[in-house]
């Protein structure tokens, strides 16, 4: 049974600015060390940061909580499986809320075109 859906679209140039200005404090607040390493190692790092940010926003929309009650950007992490498929890992309060709601699965799709990055996420009970 579907519990919630979330969609978010992000302008990649916003993250290009953060990367160009070397705004590490913002990037470190939003992304986990593993995400920072992954994105920073890519030729188009801003695109990868934007996709991960959109996924986190989509998750918060699907869950219906936003960033409150102790949920942190660091509690949501986007990783890729061995075939490149994106997956969301949850820790901390985000993981607790996911479990408390009786949720079982996260379906995540990421895409980009031109200067836009989009994430679509479905939470299943």
UniProtKB/Swiss-Prot annotation:
Gene3D superfamilies: 4'-phosphopantetheinyl transferase domain. It is found in: Cytoplasm. Pfam families: ACPS. InterPro entries: 4-PPantetheinyl_Trfase_dom, 4-PPantetheinyl_Trfase_dom_sf, ACPS, Ppantetheine-prot_Trfase_dom. One of its GO terms (molecular function) is holo-[acyl-carrier-protein] synthase activity. Mg(2+) binds at residues 8, 57. Keywords: Cytoplasm, Fatty acid biosynthesis, Fatty acid metabolism, Lipid biosynthesis, Lipid metabolism, Magnesium, Metal-binding, Transferase. Its EC number is 2.7.8.7. The keyword Transmembrane helix does not apply. Its cofactor is Mg(2+). Its main location: cytoplasm. It comes from the Bacteria. It catalyses: apo-[ACP] + CoA = holo-[ACP] + adenosine 3',5'-bisphosphate + H(+). Transfers the 4'-phosphopantetheine moiety from coenzyme A to a Ser of acyl-carrier-protein. This is Holo-[acyl-carrier-protein] synthase.
